[in-house]
Amino acid sequence: VNSFFKENLINKGVNRYNKKPISIANYSPYNYFNKVLYISGQLPIVNGRLRYSGKIGDEINKNNSEDCVLICVSNILWNVSDFLENTEEKIDEISCLNLRGFFNTVDKYEDHSKLLDKASTLIVEVLGTKHGKHSRLAIGCASLPKNSPVEIEAIFSIL
């Protein structure tokens, strides 16, 4: 599964935006405990820099907000790949259990769920329906770290 996952990301055209997992403060980009992989909230960071900043519905338009989501979920999936490359455990199965999307939006914004659909769709494309379908939360926020428009975190089962 370890090399298959990375090959699948490449074959599906999932861009790798950073050479290694990134954390912007005193935390780990991911944590593995008891067969569960917790991916810290990912911002739309490309080559170590925030690609977009501002509020969705104001400075950030629909296309840019969708791009933010795809960058965040790509960063999540590449963090999973990095974990798989560095673990010594034998892994047979990876499933996405939960996805949480936080959106820095103007007050009247209502399409949080539609934005998070972009992330859910990519995860299902990579893992398949059986292992990719997940529970999730999409929520609007008054602000996010670094004035990021989007932050997404994920939880995976690793068996």
Model-derived regions: residue spans:
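N-terminal presequence-like segments and the immediate start of the first folded domain
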Residues: 1-97, 105-159
